[in-house]
């Protein structure tokens, strides 16, 4: 979030991170699961529409899909690129196991009204992940031709760079909004899930089984704030922890 605001609004990344943290913490604490679930639907639609629009404009500017492909390097069109099958598998397996064990997704699945809705949610999640991730990667690949010569650090923000430099203003704004939706949705889930687990699975189960529903709601909101502050401090003042988390997640 800090890097996104730094690129878009030209503010200090640290200030951007603080603004993002405050917004996400307050929103998650005040909204709760039901509101976040509905927000995630809107975020998902916005993400999908934004990346589809971005890819469509990049391909159109290149003169069509065949011309866009012809301008890519051979390794960009091969299955494993220049890394080989072993390195590709080393990236695939951790990501796969991460998704299979992502607690915030299971929390949403278990919140479904019935088994059929939960199964449909799983199918939609898998299909949506494949579609959106493929489109995001496509923006990165096609964008590397529009904005060549990016270093390692700059290439990590290529989606935002494409939105600001290569796309029409309206389309770029939509793509930036899609990126913002991804950040907010991820932060909401990563705050609400551990807070709920700590309250339901630890506090209510082992410490105070007779706690009322009103107290659970209040304590969960306070836990969201506490975890958000801890996460912000860990990410900004202990960079090695953030680096390991980013490595594990990406």
What does each of the following model-derived ranges do?
Residues 1-250:
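Membrane-embedded helix-loop-helix hairpins and adjacent transmembrane boundary segments
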């Amino acid at each position: 979030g800090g890097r996104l605001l730094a690129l878009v609004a030209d503010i200090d990344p640290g200030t951007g991170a603080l603004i993002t943290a405050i917004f996400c913490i307050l929103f998650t604490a005040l909204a709760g699961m039901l509101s976040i679930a509905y927000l995630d639907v809107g975020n998902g639609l916005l993400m999908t529409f934004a990346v589809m629009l971005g890819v469509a404009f990049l391909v159109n500017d290149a003169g069509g899909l065949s011309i866009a492909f012809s301008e890519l390097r051979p390794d960009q069109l091969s299955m494993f690129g220049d890394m080989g099958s072993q390195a590709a598998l080393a990236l695939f397996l951790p990501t796969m196991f991460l998704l299979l064990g992502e607690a915030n997704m299971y929390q949403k699945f278990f919140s479904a009204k019935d088994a059929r809705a939960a199964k449909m949610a799983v199918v939609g999640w898998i299909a949506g992940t494949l579609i959106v991730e493929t489109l995001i990667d496509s923006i990165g690949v096609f964008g590397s031709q529009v904005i060549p010569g990016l270093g390692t650090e700059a290439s990590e923000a290529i989606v935002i760079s494409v939105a600001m430099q290569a796309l029409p203003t309206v389309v770029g704004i939509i793509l930036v909004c899609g990126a913002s939706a991804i950040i907010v949705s991820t932060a909401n889930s990563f705050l609400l899930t551990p807070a709920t687990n700590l309250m339901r699975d630890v506090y209510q189960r082992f410490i105070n089984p007779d706690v009322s529903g009103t107290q659970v709601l209040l304590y969960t909101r306070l836990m969201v704030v506490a975890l958000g502050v801890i996460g912000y401090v860990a990410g900004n003042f202990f960079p090695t922890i953030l680096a390991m988390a980013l490595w594990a997640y990406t």
